Amino acid sequence: MKAFNKLFSLVVASVLVFSLAGCGDKEESKKFSANLNGTEIAITYVYKGDKVLKQSSETKIQFASIGATTKEDAAKTLEPLSAKYKNIAGVEEKLTYTDTYAQENVTIDMEKVDFKALQGISGINVSAEDAKKGITMAQMELVMKAAGFKEVK
């Protein structure tokens, strides 16, 4: 559970790293993946110039990695975390279960997200000024690689 909470905070924290954003003509995307403590994570960034427009994450959480053996056990741990995303502007979250793992998909529209509400999930503080500047793809690449993610080409 502690490992999952750290992992969960890492994913959210990656969203909240800010610096000045540039402009460009066409949208591009970059995908990063990692297997952290038995949890498979794939994060895709859509960006224009150097400004991140959207982040989508697909997380496959093995029940064993959170100390659960059944869907019901996993739900007791994961549903309260999932519920925190509900009603946050610019965030879509879906959590589904199989017999051995949970699949969480989260999409964050960086141009619509309520950063103040989002930071409440992980407890990270971001100033209003930083939120207005935007998130750069260059910074996200550094954050992802430092966290053990590899770019998927």
From Swiss-Prot:
Lipid attachment in record (N-palmitoyl cysteine): 23
Keyword Lipoprotein among record annotations: yes
Keywords: Cell membrane, Lipoprotein, Membrane, Palmitate, Signal
Residues with lipidation of kind S-diacylglycerol cysteine: 23
Cellular component GO terms held in the UniProt record: plasma membrane
Subcellular location: Cell membrane
Record's bilayer topology term: Lipid-anchor
Record's keyword annotation contains Ribonucleoprotein: no
Signal peptide: 1-22
Entry's family note: To L.monocytogenes lmo0207.
Protein name as annotated: Uncharacterized lipoprotein YehR
Originating gene: yehR
